[in-house]
């Protein structure tokens, strides 16, 4: 199987319990976060004490590209939504937008499957954040990897000002540990 640097990093992480530092609030206007009944993806994410972001989600038939397999754009969205959370780890007021995504699909992402999306700690260079991560299938194998470049918006930017107005809600179920 062909691999790349991000795949190798993600494959080297031991599958074990990781202590949750805190859950990540979500917004009703967020496509990735809001409940499926409201058209969202219902991703729930957590910061761990070992500096990962770990999220859970369950794939569904309505987001298939081929029968039984999630659409590639949906796979990209799972990764973008979760990796982006590393930009807010130290300061929730930071607002960042995606500049570039390098994405590799390793295995089909089947429907009706609980997945884990994991983001490594960000590499930061001024306003630029570089985050790597993966989607794990229930058997621990990697379905997709990404390296995403984000840029932080300036505080007086119109988009950033609107983002600060969004109502954030707590995660419904607090976890002490999460496995990936």
Label for each model-derived stretch:
Residues 25-70:
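Catalytic strand-loop segment that frames the active site of acyl-thioester-processing enzymes
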Residues 53, 97-99, 115, 129, ...:
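Hydrophobic core residues within well-ordered beta-strands of beta-rich domains
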């Amino acid at each position: 199987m062909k691999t790349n640097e991000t795949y190798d990093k993600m494959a080297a992480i031991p599958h074990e319990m990781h202590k949750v530092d805190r859950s990540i609030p979500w917004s009703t206007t967020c496509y990735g976060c809001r409940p499926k009944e409201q058209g969202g993806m219902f991703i729930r994410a957590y910061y761990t004490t070992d500096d990962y972001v770990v999220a859970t989600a369950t794939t569904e038939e309505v987001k298939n590209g081929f029968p039984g397999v999630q659409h590639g754009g949906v796979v990209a969205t799972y990764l973008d939504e979760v990796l982006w959370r590393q930009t807010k780890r130290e300061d929730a007021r930071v607002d960042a937008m995606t500049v570039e995504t390098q994405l590799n699909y390793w295995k089909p992402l089947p429907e009706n499957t609980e997945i884990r999306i994991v983001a490594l700690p960000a590499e930061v260079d001024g306003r630029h954040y570089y985050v790597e991560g993966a989607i794990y299938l229930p058997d621990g194998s990697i379905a997709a990897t990404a390296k995403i470049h984000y840029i932080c918006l300036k505080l007086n930017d119109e988009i950033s000002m609107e983002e600060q107005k969004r109502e954030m809600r707590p995660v419904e179920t607090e976890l002490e540990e999460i496995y990936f």
